[in-house]
Every structure is written in structure tokens, then in C-alpha cells.
Amino acid sequence: MEHDLERGPPGPRRPPRGPPLSSSLGLALLLLLLALLFWLYIVMSDWTGGALLVLYSFALMLIIIILIIFIFRRDLLCPLGALCILLLMITLLLIALWNLHGQALFLGIVLFIFGCLLVLGIWIYLLEMLWRLGATIWQLLAFFLAFFLDLILLIIALYLQQNWWTLLVDLLWLLLFLAILIWMYYHGQRHSDEHHHDDSLPHPQQATDDSGHESDSNSNEGRHHLLVSGAGDGPPLCSQNLGAPGGGPDNGPQDPDNTDDNGPQDPDNTDDNGPHDPLPQDPDNTDDNGPQDPDNTDDNGPHDPLPHSPSDSAGNDGGPPQLTEEVENKGGDQGPPLMTDGGGGHSHDSGHGGGDPHLPTLLLGSSGSGGDDDDPHGPVQLSYYD
């Protein structure tokens, strides 16, 4: 059963209506017994009674129905009891109109019409209540036709003025109200059980709040996932280097030793394509155009008299070799020297040779930002490509 979202949380369950007190129940049973005795006396006293006898008998039957409702289902006194009381008042009005004349008769007729309209309204309200309790359209149609059939039979009883017909009509009215009572007893009890069952379920507002907390927790988890998965400062720790295959040419600015590694390489892995001194070479057959070492010689020539350690492209002589394969230069100074056997590339110690170009190469290089490569705290990028 759907709840209104604007309604607050369900309150405590209302205790069921208890049975009537023993004194009131005994009094109702006594009145019911007296009403039955009076009704039987009126019906069986004169089998050829007139219209007033029919109305008296019908009025007593309505009182009997009201007492039955009070004894068994007091909660139905409002719709069914009000209908019976209104019918009883109309019956008494008809008994009074039977001997009236003139303006009193006219006023009585107006009141009679007004009472009939009230009876019709209460009957429609009763059918609507049955519909809300789960009655089908065929059950409502059966109650509606039975009600109007009893009215027609009552009019026929007033016309015939026979007590046996009056007895039959009164019993039909009693049967109609008993059928409504029995139907409402079973279906109303089931409806009450379903209502209590629905109240025990969580309220939609509470479910909305729970879903809101759940969505907040999900969003917090998503936010935590973003923090953990590394959308922070710097490049990702593991990435794929999509540089030139095989360690292609380095077209950046020349190294501090005024050499470029793009030309044909000498045995010492240097290029002699830089500008040469127009003067003849020194006796040591070396070129003094580049930055000179402490021995006043340049390592760019083919006949370096002294053994020389592999120089760092950044100007650092000697030192332990850097475990790097290839650095992607993006506009800054070239990184540490390359000590790889990259296929098709060049290196300081391996010359034109190299490993198999089809094998994958593990790259251990800088972040590619072109910054200072001597920073020990800079992020390291692991690259892997074929």
C-alpha cells in the first residue's frame, strides 16, 4: 500500500477495539430479544393488516438490524447504523403522513423527499467504502440491486397490505444488512492486517534518507578511489612510452661539448661534424675547438692520447653509469647518457649495434618534463614498448 511521501513517520499502532462491556452487551441482547418479539407479534397478529402495520413491522426490523450491528460490529454503526436510523425516521414520517392533510401533508412530502436523498447519499458512501475495502464491481452491483429490490418490494408490500408479504420483505432487508456485515467483517479484517503489515515496513522518507546516506557513502568511496588511483600531481607511475621506435635521432640542442650524436660516429662515440679550427691541429693530433679537458685536449678527435671515461652529456665526467634507456626530450636539456642496446639507435658504448629491435624494451627514464635530471626526488617513469 502506497504511503504519502509528505506524511510523517508512522505512529504507534492503535490498539484494537475491545468487545463491548458485559452490561451494555447484555442490554443490547435484551433489546434485540424484545424487538424480535414485538416484530413477530405485529406480523402474526393480523394477516390482513393495513399499510400502517407494514410500516410498523418494517420500523421494528430496522431497530433489530441496528441492535445486531451494535452487538457484533460497533465500528460500523456510522455507515450502516445511520442508514437504518434514517430509514426508520422516513418510515415514521410515512406513518404520520398517512393521516395528514393540507399544508402539513405538503411539508411532510418535502421532508420525505429530503430523507430519501439522504438515504441515497449514505448508500453511495457505503458502496464507496466497500470499494476501498476491495469489493469488486460485481459485488457492488449486487448490493446496489439488492437495495433497490428491497425498496420496490417494500412499496409492493404497502400496496398489497398482506402480512405474509410484509414478513418476506422484512426478512430480505435483514438478509441484505447481514450480508454487508459479514462481507465487511472478513474483508475489513484482512484490510486491517495489510495496513499493519505496511506500517511495519520502512517509511518511504526513511528509505529516501537511507538511500541518500548510501549515495553519500558511495560518493565518498568514489572520491577515495580517485585519490588512490593517482589523479594527483605529476605523471603516473607506470606509463607507456610512445617515443620513436628503436631510439631514433636526438634532434634537440647540442651537448655542452659542441657535438651532435646524429652524424657518423667515431670510435669514441662522438661526432666530428662540429665546426673545426681552420688552423692545423696540435701536435697531439687533437682538435681544440670544443671545451677542453684539464689536459688541454679535446675528446672529439680520433686520436685521444689519454684514456677518457664516457662523458656525461650534461657535463659530468665519470661516475657510475646511469641505468636509463631512453629519455624523451621535450624541449629541455638532454637527460643522462644512454646505455642501452636499443635496436637501430645509438649509444655511447655499443655503436651502431644493438639488441634485437623486435624485443620489448623496458624504459627507466625521467618524467619527460625537460627539467633537471639530477633531482633525486623527481618522479620516475616506467615505460614499456615494443
Curated annotation (Swiss-Prot):
This protein's membrane topology, according to the annotation, is: Multi-pass membrane protein
The residue ranges crossing the membrane are: 24-44, 52-72, 76-96, 107-127, 140-160, 164-184
Q: Which UniProt keywords apply?
A: Activation of host NF-kappa-B by virus, Host cell membrane, Host membrane, Host-virus interaction, Inhibition of host innate immune response by virus, Inhibition of host interferon signaling pathway by virus, Inhibition of host RLR pathway by virus, Inhibition of host TRAFs by virus, Inhibition of host TYK2 by virus, Interferon antiviral system evasion, Membrane, Oncogene, Phosphoprotein, Transmembrane, Transmembrane helix, Ubl conjugation, Viral immunoevasion
Q: How is it modified after translation?
A: Ubiquitinated on the N-terminus.
Give compartment(s).
Host cell membrane
List all Low complexity biased stretches.
251-267
Pfam families reported in the protein's UniProt record: Herpes_LMP1 (PF05297)
Primary location group: host cell
Q: Tell me the residue ranges located in the Cytoplasmic compartment per UniProt.
A: 1-23, 73-75, 128-139, 185-386
A cellular component term from Gene Ontology for this protein is: host cell membrane
GO BP terms: namely: symbiont-mediated activation of host NF-kappaB cascade; symbiont-mediated suppression of host JAK-STAT cascade via inhibition of host TYK2 activity; symbiont-mediated suppression of host TRAF-mediated signal transduction; symbiont-mediated suppression of host type I interferon-mediated signaling pathway; symbiont-mediated transformation of host cell
**Which segments show compositional bias classed as Basic and acidic residues?**
210-224
| Residue numbers spanned by region CTAR2 | 351-386
Annotated region (Disordered), positions in chain: 194-386
What are the boundaries of the region CTAR1?
194-232
Q: Which residues lie on this side of the membrane: Extracellular?
A: 45-51, 97-106, 161-163
Q: Where is this motif: Interaction with host TRAF proteins?
A: 204-208
Decide whether keyword Transit peptide is in the record: no
- Function according to Swiss-Prot or TrEMBL: Acts as a CD40 functional homolog to prevent apoptosis of infected B-lymphocytes and drive their proliferation. Functions as a constitutively active tumor necrosis factor receptor that induces the activation of several signaling pathways, including those of the NF-kappa-B family. LMP1 signaling leads to up-regulation of antiapoptotic proteins and provide growth signals in latently infected cells. Interacts with host UBE2I and subsequently affects the sumoylation state of several cellular proteins.
Task: Fill in the domain comment.
Answer: Two regions, C-terminal-activating region 1 (CTAR1) and CTAR2, have been identified within the cytoplasmic carboxy terminal domain that activates NF-kappa-B.
The name this protein carries in UniProt is Latent membrane protein 1
